[in-house]
C-alpha cells in the first residue's frame, strides 16, 4: 500500500526519473496518465503495486492515487474508508464471537441435560463416555470424506505428541461422567469450578512455575466455595465428589501436555479436537469393556427401554452428538479469542449449566449451598483476571 505521498520540486515517481517533455512517448507498465502532461513536483514512495490516474478538470490537474494489495483487484481503503472498513470488521468479529459463545453455552446445557437423563436410566458411565467419543469421531470422519472439513495433515510425531493429551482427556471425560452418574449435575459443575486451584498447584509444585500473589489469593474463594457446597450438599456421594476432583486434575494435565506438545502444529481447533477424540476412543474402548462389559450393557439397555420407552434411544444419540458439538465449538472459539476471554466465557458457561440443571431437574438447593456455588464461581472469575 502507499507509504507516503508528498510534494517536492523534482518530477519523479518512485524509482522512475523522467523528463516531462519526453514522457509523452511511453509510460511504465505500472503507471497510467491519460492527461497530456504529468503533474510536476510529485514524489510517490511505494512498497506495493500502484495505479495512478490523472484527470484534467477546470483549471488544474488532479492526481488520483489508488493502492492495490498485491493479491487483490480492488483498491485498498484509505482514510475514512479504511476506518469505516475497520469498524465494520470489528463489529463482524464481535458478532462472530458472540455467536460462538451462545452456541457453545446452549450446546453444553443440552448435552448435560441429556447426559443426566441417560445416566439416570442407564447407569453405565464408561459406555456412555465411549459413545460420546465414537459419535464425534464418526461425524468428523464423514466431514473429511465428503470435503465439508479439510483433512488435517498429520504425521507420526503429531500422534505421538497427542497421545499424553488423549490419555489425560480420556481420564477427565470418564471421571466427569462417573461423577454425574452419582450426583446432581449442578454439584459436579460446582466442584469442577475448582479446576484453577489444581492448575496452580500442579504448575507450582510439579513444573516449578511461580504466580503473582493475586493468583494465590483468588484460590481462597474457589476452594472455600467448593468446600461449602460439598459440606451442604443434600445428596452428597463420595464417588461423585471424587470423580469431579479427578476430572479436574486430569484436565489440568491435558492442558499442560497440549500447550507443551502442540506448539508450532498447524492444525485447526476443529481438527485438533477431532484427532483427540479418535485417539481417546481407541484408549477408552478396551477399558470400558473390561470395567462394565457387553453383558451388563445389554441387560441395562433392555431395562432402560422398558422403563423409558423408545425415546431413550434419542437421549443416547443426543447426548453423544451434543458432547462432540459443544467441545468442537469451544475449540473453534479458542482459535478466535484470547485465553482471558475464553476463561470468562467458560465461567459463564458453568453458571448457565448449574442454573439450567437445577431448574430442569428440580434439584433441591439450600441457601448455604447456593452461596458456596456463587463464591466458587466468583473465585474462578477472579482467577482468570489475575492469571492474565
From Swiss-Prot:
GO CC annotation: chloroplast; chloroplast membrane; endoplasmic reticulum membrane; peroxisomal membrane; peroxisome; plastid
Disruption phenotype annotation: Gametophytic lethal phenotype in homozygous plants.
Transmembrane segments: 95-115, 129-149, 158-178, 211-231, 233-253, 273-293, 305-325, 363-383
Transit peptide boundaries: 1-65
Keywords (A to Z) from UniProt: Chloroplast, Endoplasmic reticulum, Membrane, Peroxisome, Plastid, Sugar transport, Transit peptide, Transmembrane, Transmembrane helix, Transport
Membrane-topology annotation of the record: Multi-pass membrane protein
GO BP term, pick one: triose phosphate transmembrane transport
Major location (coarse): plastid
Pfam families: TPT
Known tissue expression: Expressed in seeds, flowers, rosette leaves, and roots, with highest levels found in stamens. Found in the root cap, in guard cells and in mesophyll cells.
An annotated Gene Ontology molecular function: phosphate transmembrane transporter activity
UniProt subcellular location: Plastid, Chloroplast membrane; Endoplasmic reticulum membrane; Peroxisome membrane
Domain EamA: 112-229
Protein's job: Glucose 6-phosphate (Glc6P) transporter. Also transports inorganic phosphate, 3-phosphoglycerate, triose phosphates and, to a leser extent, phosphoenolpyruvate. Responsible for the transport of Glc6P into plastids of heterotrophic tissues where it can be used as a carbon source for starch biosynthesis, as substrate for fatty acid biosynthesis or as substrate for NADPH generation via the oxidative pentose phosphate pathway (OPPP). Required for pollen maturation and embryo sac development. Preferentially exchanges Glc6P for ribulose-5-phosphate (Ru5P) in reconstituted yeast proteoliposomes.
Family annotation (PANTHER family): SOLUTE CARRIER FAMILY 35
Protein family: Belongs to the TPT transporter family. GPT (TC 2.A.7.9) subfamily.
Protein known as: Glucose-6-phosphate/phosphate translocator 1, chloroplastic
Gene name of the record: GPT1
